[in-house]
């Protein structure tokens, strides 16, 4: 005990215990009095002004900042330290089969046109992008721009549907055929036009009325039957029974082929399309009809409910003619390339004619296809027939000679420039025309696909032709085998005026415009 504490204790009496709190309080009061006395004798503090030339930056910090503090090293900032094993990525080589992968670097937030080096093998460098066929932009002065701006800023993709018409009522017997509204077509590239067109089509289709009232109802059923036949004959299950059967649907649209994928009993579906509205509709369609329990064993798969989708599905928005498959899928579905690729089938329905705008796009598409397919896997597609187009040109079967247009009341093809008299297009890329199909496609630019050129390019990518026929021949030869397998409503929707089934009249010429094809990837 200190002398001071002893003195306090004695003043309280020898029998009184020392109260520590009381001692502390008294000591504190005494110390405060001494400080107040010393403060009186101190000179007043001098006020520091900004213009006194004194550095006061350190005065605002509570920490001692003498500039000689030792920096603690860390594995995050010491280059001499080795990265611990737990921090190393296990997937640094996950895209080696698609191409070399360099260390990612910081990129500016503004979009740039430089290709991602990680997917160099997925990209095609053989064609100069400056050679791309572009639509010449219209010359617009600043004053004209100001006048047009308010109108053009109305987004093409969200044109108001037929909500003000009686046809918006589901009980109405009226039907409104589809019409697109795309601003400034001449100043837009094909991607923008196609995206806007199909976004509008997706939105307006909800308000058109019953599809059975469509002027191309029978034609749609016919085309669907062709796709059932092609997929039914050529989707081959994975030879490894432990692997799922996977189909990659490029340019999948609104998911119109989901029923066909259930028909061929796939286990996994991957859909990609350039139209975000179409992708949303495809996902919605899948979600509404997905089976509650997905069969996982061979026995349960035999008892799958074909009225529901007994397969898993994922959807992504992307341009498979300009971007690699990993670039489109991996950001939204990490690990999907390792988990589901290579796939058993790539489906490309009514879309490849958009790629033939440039050779670069075709090479990118075929790179995506061959890198995605397993050996023995198939590429199944439908495209306009270059033979059909050539015959129309050679026979001068134009309904409008001046405008270079052929077709009928259901469909039409209008060339951008005079086609060659012999119907053979050289060079084979960028030979454009505008295609219209009543209630489906409204004057959208497409490009001639010279099939032998396409076939030669496929062979360069290890894809060999297995099947090629026009729609009429496919139907006549294959429909007897599928007549009892297809949905009754689909079959009845193809009934002709003579009681038989198939296409007739204007519809027959419109469906004759297309062919179906199948390529198989070579390899062991």
Curated annotation (Swiss-Prot):
Primary location recorded for the protein, binned into one broad class: nucleus
Binding locations of S-adenosyl-L-methionine: 227, 251, 273, 319, 349, 354
Subcellular location(s) of the protein: Nucleus
Catalytic activity entry: a 5'-end (5'-triphosphoguanosine)-ribonucleoside in mRNA + S-adenosyl-L-methionine = a 5'-end (N(7)-methyl 5'-triphosphoguanosine)-ribonucleoside in mRNA + S-adenosyl-L-homocysteine
InterPro entries: mRNA_G-N7_MeTrfase_dom (IPR004971), mRNA_G-N7_MeTrfase_euk (IPR016899), RG7MT1 (IPR039753), SAM-dependent_MTases_sf (IPR029063)
Enzyme class: transferase
Protein name as it appears in the record: mRNA cap guanine-N(7) methyltransferase
Organism: Debaryomyces hansenii (strain ATCC 36239 / CBS 767 / BCRC 21394 / JCM 1990 / NBRC 0083 / IGC 2968)
